Amino acid sequence: MFLAEQLSNFYPDIQDKRFISNFAVYHQRYSTNTFPTWSLAQPFRVIAHNGEINTLKGNKNWMEAHEPRMIHASYDKDIDDLKPIIDRTASDSAALDSTIELLVRTKRSLPMAKLMTIPEAFAHRRDFPKKLKDLYTYANAVMESWDGPAAICGCHDQWAIAGMDRNGLRPLRYTLTNDFLITGSETGMVEIDEAEILERGRVGPGQMIAVNFKAVSYTHLTLPTILLV
């Protein structure tokens, strides 16, 4: 709803040096499917999304079909208070956020929620380990995928993620420095001393960067799927 340079004027508390956070998520994109309103301003409760969900109608219908049989120990008899999971008037981004929020609040990690909703194209990948294919097969059995151009960033509990749709139809770059991990649609969003950069690259189709705030070190997996930090 405003430009990046106006953010500190709208939220003056972020200019206070005592205001400290492990992460920040900022979204600045024009609205393609809905008219811009404050209620649809991103990031939402869990994620920010750049793209379009082409399977939105089917995803909403499937979620509505799942609702009568939803049970979870965390909510017990209060499960009906969560319904409808997706507001029928919600944008595609807001609907995806509601679905991911349901998953993380029912004890799934944010990386798991991402691969359940926006999985990789795995069926014919010979370079995938069997355990990884089995994981995606399980996810495919319990959750319909949300397909379409999608680059997402989000945070919940001890995790922050950035991930892509299975076709890689949106740009998503990352830069790893001595102190920070920065992901976004373009490289160069934040001025960084080149001497501080350890690694930079792109997040590929279906891939994900996942940061665990409780970890004391980072690990770059060699699998063609996930970069864990």
Residue spans for each PLM region:
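Conserved mixed alpha/beta core segments that line enzyme active sites in large multi-domain catalysts
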Residues: 1-59, 102, 111-210
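Short, charged beta-turn/beta-strand-edge "cap" motif at the junction between a beta-strand
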Residues: 60-61, 214-217
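Contiguous hydrophobic segments
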Residues: 119, 216-219
